[in-house]
Amino acid sequence: MEETRNCQNCKKDFTIEPDDFGFYEKMNVPAPTWCPECRMVRRLVWRNERNLFRRKDAHTGKDSFSGIPVEAPIQTYETSFWYGDEWDALDYGVDYDFSVPFFKQFQDLFHRVPIMAKSSAGFMINSDYCNEAGRLKNAYLCFDADFIEDSAYLVKVTNVKNSFDSHELVDDELCYECVMVYKSYQTFFSLDCENCVDVWFSKGLRGCTNCVGGVNLRGKSYDFFNEPRTKEDYEKKLADMDLKSHATISRIRAEAFAFWQKFPVKYYHGIRNLNCT
């Protein structure tokens, strides 16, 4: 029988299904007192990649940017010093005490041993405001990023140049406001596209060039909202759209999003997978 409980954190009601109780009994754990949403927040709070704080470096005493809040009882070292040979984490070693719970000892050790102020690797040139990143040059507010150059406001990106305001890009250049775009060039306001060039307001394209508002196209060129055009007609229509205007961009983006809703949505994003759901 399902049971409704009140979350001790957000105070909203949530339901525990009969199958859930069976699972808790099997795992020999009590039923949750927090709702699923609050439990998810609690799990995710361990990893902070996008919030930066100004805190004192434990070695130099100077201010530095860090992914660790100032109030956290942890010592941080600037990344290059942390990687260096001037200190040794083994110096903080202690004997294990079998009379004290493991996690209490682990917590105490974690609070004593300095950690990196920001998580980064390789060269970081003019990219102080980035975290969980490596091999960046002239990057600003890029997170979970690797091999990025002349870009800003990116999350979960690899090998990207001259791109802004996007999430999950790989092997891209000159992209703006894109999500899940791979191996593409000059792609704007688009979602789930790969191997594309000069694409605007599109979704689910593969190997396409010069498309506006396309959905689920393969190997197409000079398409406007899934209608094929001649090269001359397409270029004239594109020139008449005045894409330098913010009002025009907002209008066409809304039209494209409404157009997207008319097409089936892929239930699963993945390739070369076996027995996966």
Role assignments for model-derived ranges:
Residues 1-277:
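Long, distal/terminal scaffolding or interaction modules
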